[in-house]
């Protein structure tokens, strides 16, 4: 069974978001703007943007490639013959 708060809390949040917030928000908004008047923090470093790429990873010479830590050729074991 699902506990009662697990059902009641999401329903109450939905009711608030759907019906109460449009009524209450215009009254609360000026108060919130006085408390938090600052804008969002902007990223100041442009070097971070230069380091970003299109999702490819630039591997260095010491990185692990394809899950293999060893260097050079690996010995491939022969198949078992009966």
UniProtKB/Swiss-Prot annotation:
Q: Where in the cell is it found?
A: Endoplasmic reticulum; Lipid droplet
From the record, give the transmembrane residue ranges. none
An annotated GO cellular component: lipid droplet
Query: Residues annotated as region Necessary for its localzation to the endoplasmic reticulum and lipid droplets?
Result: 1-37
Entry's Pfam families?
A: DUF4512
Q: Where is the composition biased (Basic and acidic residues)?
A: 71-82
**Residues covered by region (Disordered):** 46-82
Which residues fall in a compositionally biased region of kind Polar residues? 54-69
Please report which protein family the annotation says this sequence is part of.
Answer: Belongs to the UPF0729 family.
Protein name per Swiss-Prot or TrEMBL = UPF0729 protein C18orf32 homolog
Which species is this UniProt entry from? Xenopus tropicalis
Q: Source taxonomy lineage?
A: Eukaryota, Metazoa, Chordata, Craniata, Vertebrata
